[in-house]
């Protein structure tokens, strides 16, 4: 009974001082001290006094500023980026930004502008990026031209513009990006384009405008970085209108909801009169496709035929000898050989993703592509019991291979011996059957990145990753370990060059203290979404300066002896753990507040215990674990009782002694 009373006494003594101090600051979020702030969607009608004068980057969208003038932002003279998206701005008065000499980006997207003064943009010495998307502009005369000499990008999408004719004094010399997408531009004249003559290597976007006519010679002798006429139903209009022009990239893709004309071989002859390096024709249909369909593509280096309903390409096609990149994703091939790879002798990059039908690899279908460096065959339901030597025959220069999101693949020893130069191999979400005692990757001496996410591997095979001397990035997410434990001897011991290791969602319960002992070069370790306790932190004691993700585990109390291990890391994520916020964990809670600069996900790092603090951020908790006033009172009473007890005990002993002399 005395023991129970004393325990109760100490509980009262030390728990009476536990309390939480929280702050619910609804004002702007500081992203970088004194420089970057987010004030989005706070219902503000003016700049808060809490923002420092040194603010450089301000996100102020979804507030209420119907009128802005030269006093609205005058205090923030160091602004370089200002986002005023959907602030219901109607009026921008004279000299609004006169004191903002360093402002380079101004976002006015989604504001129903009625008036912009001629001098409203005066002040910034190097305004480079101006966003006027969804502002109701119907005429380019609305845009004030003063002080736009250094403008590099102008975004005018989703307005009511029907003519791209700029004012005569519009400064286009430094313009690099001009975006007119989703307007009402149906005709482009020579006079319209004359105002852009000074712009060199311009990226011009007419996507979603349904251009129906281009005056002959409008693009004559012009040079563009990119041209986008996406969603144009009749491509003949574009090919005829772009005669004698030069562009690095021409985007002519369409969309599923647009009823456009099929592409004919005759239509593509318009490319003979222009110079193009990259062409996108996605979502179109070919009325006929023959060996001469692409005969005008002699200068083409990149071709995107995504979702063009192709079932095969004829052999002996002309005009594609210089092609280096080919995209054939979302088509209807039955077998890889149907692409007639011999048509593309210079090809270095091939992408066939998401084929509509189950794709069969065949044997040696790509052997004519001896220069191929990148091959993406993901999301194709590919299935093979013996992969991949015969299928990838003669691809000795291949550096990147993506076989992710496919059906089960069987891998023999040296399964990729035809691709000894591989640097990146992605097999994520493809069930692998390893049919050999040795590693299927053992000849890949240059492999740096290996993605084995959810491959259902036998992780007890200690030789699985043998023969990868320069592997730097390994993703084993979703592969479970026997008994939920990574033991001292494990499959990671053969990859000592690792810098990034991802072991999230592996069902881990514990990690042996010596499990990572051979991995001394690691800089990034992801152990999130497991069931690890704080004891597993010991396995990281030899690592310093790493990014450590321990989110969503079973960590509650972190003992003081483990804090030095955490202190020596650069970034730590402990969010979504059932952390204890009582005095039993006071050393960790103190350390946490002292190291907030190292912690990621602090908004989601909350208390789970005691119930009164559940859901409260650790950074908002303040515990008082010393002796409180109530505790002192009880202590005095306890000591007084103890003194009385001792007094009577001594008195009793003395009386007993004298009685027995």
UniProtKB/Swiss-Prot annotation:
InterPro entries the UniProt entry points to: Cys-rich_flank_reg_C, Leu-rich_rpt, Leu-rich_rpt_typical-subtyp, LRR_11, LRR_dom_sf
Cell membrane in keyword set: yes
Cellular localization per UniProt: Cell membrane
Ranges annotated as spanning the membrane: 627-650
Tissue expression: Expressed mainly on mature peripherical B cells. Detected in spleen, lymph node and appendix. Not detected in pre-B and -T cells.
LRRCT domain residues: 577-627
Chief site of localization: membrane
GO biological process: B cell proliferation involved in immune response; cellular response to lipopolysaccharide; inflammatory response; innate immune response; lipopolysaccharide-mediated signaling pathway; positive regulation of lipopolysaccharide-mediated signaling pathway
Superkingdom, taxonomy of origin: Eukaryota
LRR-type repeats, residues: 54-75, 78-99, 102-123, 126-147, 150-171, 174-195, 201-221, 275-296, 299-320, 322-343, 346-366, 371-391, 397-418, 421-442, 446-466, 470-493, 497-518, 521-544, 546-564
Glycosylation sites: 34, 53, 70, 78, 201, 234, 244, 394, 402, 451, 573
Membrane topology label: Single-pass type I membrane protein
Domain LRRNT: 33-53
Keyword set, alphabetical order: Cell membrane, Glycoprotein, Immunity, Inflammatory response, Innate immunity, Leucine-rich repeat, Membrane, Receptor, Repeat, Signal, Transmembrane, Transmembrane helix
Cytoplasmic-side positions: 651-661
Residues on Extracellular side: 24-626
Signal peptide interval: 1-23
GO cellular component, one term: mitotic spindle
Family (UniProt): Belongs to the Toll-like receptor family.
Role: May cooperate with MD-1 and TLR4 to mediate the innate immune response to bacterial lipopolysaccharide (LPS) in B-cells. Leads to NF-kappa-B activation. Also involved in the life/death decision of B-cells.
PANTHER family on file: MSTPROX-RELATED, TOLL-LIKE RECEPTOR
Oligomer status and interactors: M-shaped tetramer of two CD180-LY86 heterodimers.
Protein name, as recorded: CD180 antigen
């Amino acid at each position: 009974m005395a023991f129970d009373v004393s325990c109760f006494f100490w509980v009262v003594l030390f728990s009476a001082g536990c309390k939480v101090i929280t702050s619910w600051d609804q004002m702007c979020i500081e992203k970088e001290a004194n420089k970057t702030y987010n004030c989005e969607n706070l219902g503000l009608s003016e700049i808060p006094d809490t923002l420092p004068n040194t603010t450089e980057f301000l996100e102020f969208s979804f507030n209420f500023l119907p009128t802005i003038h030269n006093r609205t932002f005058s205090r923030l003279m160091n602004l370089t980026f200002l986002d005023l998206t959907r602030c219901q701005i109607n009026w921008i008065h004279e000299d609004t930004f006169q004191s903002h000499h360093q402002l380079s980006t101004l976002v006015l997207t989604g504001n129903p502008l009625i008036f912009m003064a001629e001098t409203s943009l005066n002040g910034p010495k190097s305004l480079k990026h101006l966003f006027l998307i969804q502002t109701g502009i119907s005429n380019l005369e609305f845009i004030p031209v003063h002080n736009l000499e250094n403008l590099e990008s102008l975004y005018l999408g989703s307005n009511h513009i029907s003519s791209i004719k700029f004012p005569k004094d519009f400064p286009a010399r430094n313009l690099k990006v001009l975006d007119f997408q989703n307007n009402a531009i149906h005709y482009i004249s020579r006079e319209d384009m004359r105002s852009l003559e000074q712009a060199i290597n311009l990226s011009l976007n007419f996507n979603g405008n349904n251009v129906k006519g281009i005056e002959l010679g409008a693009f004559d002798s012009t040079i563009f970085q990119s041209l986008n006429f996406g969603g144009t139903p009749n491509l003949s209009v574009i090919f005829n209108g772009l005669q004698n022009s030069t562009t690095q990239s021409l985007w002519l893709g369409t969309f599923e909801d647009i009823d456009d004309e099929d592409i004919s071989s005759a239509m593509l002859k318009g490319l003979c009169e222009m110079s193009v390096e990259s062409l996108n024709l996605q979502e179109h249909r070919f009325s006929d496709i023959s060996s001469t369909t692409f005969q005008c593509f002699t200068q083409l280096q990149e071709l995107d035929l995504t979702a063009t309903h192709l079932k095969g390409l004829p052999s002996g096609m002309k005009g594609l000898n210089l092609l280096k990149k080919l995209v054939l994703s979302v088509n209807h091939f039955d077998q890889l050989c149907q692409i007639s790879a011999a048509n593309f002798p210079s090809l270095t990059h091939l992408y066939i993703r998401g084929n509509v039908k189950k794709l069969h690899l065949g044997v040696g279908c790509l052997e004519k592509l001896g220069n191929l460096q990148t091959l993406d065959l993901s999301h194709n339901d590919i299935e093979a019991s013996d992969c991949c030597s015969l299928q990838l025959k003669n691809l000795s220069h291949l550096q990147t291979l993506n076989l992710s999101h496919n059906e089960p693949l069987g891998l023999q020893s040296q399964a990729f011996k035809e691709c000894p130069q591989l640097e990146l191999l992605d097999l994520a979400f493809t069930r692998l059957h390893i049919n050999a005692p040795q590693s299927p990757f053992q000849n890949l001496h240059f492999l740096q990145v290996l993605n084995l996410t959810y491959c259902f591997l036998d992780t007890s095979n200690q030789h699985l990753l043998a023969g990868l001397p320069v592997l730097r990035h390994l993703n084993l997410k979703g592969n479970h370990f026997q008994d939920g434990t990574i033991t001292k001897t494990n499959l990671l011991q053969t990859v000592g060059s690792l810098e990034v290791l991802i072991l999230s969602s592996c069902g881990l319960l514990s990690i042996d203290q010596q499990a990572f002992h051979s991995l001394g070069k690691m800089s990034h370790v992801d152990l999130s979404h497991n069931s690890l306790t704080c004891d597993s932190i010991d396995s990281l004691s030899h690592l310093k300066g790493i990014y450590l993700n321990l989110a969503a585990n079973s960590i509650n109390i972190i003992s003081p002896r483990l804090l030095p291990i955490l202190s020596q890391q650069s970034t730590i994520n402990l969010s979504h753990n059932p952390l204890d916020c009582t005095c039993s964990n006071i050393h960790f809670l103190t350390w946490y507040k002292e190291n907030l600069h190292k912690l990621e996900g602090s908004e989601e790092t909350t208390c789970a215990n005691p119930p009164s603090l559940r859901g409260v951020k650790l950074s908002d908790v303040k515990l008082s674990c010393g002796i409180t006033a109530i505790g002192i009172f009880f202590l005095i009473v306890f000591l007084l009782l103890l003194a009385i007890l001792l007094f009577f005990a001594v008195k009793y002993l003395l009386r007993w002694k004298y009685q027995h002399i």
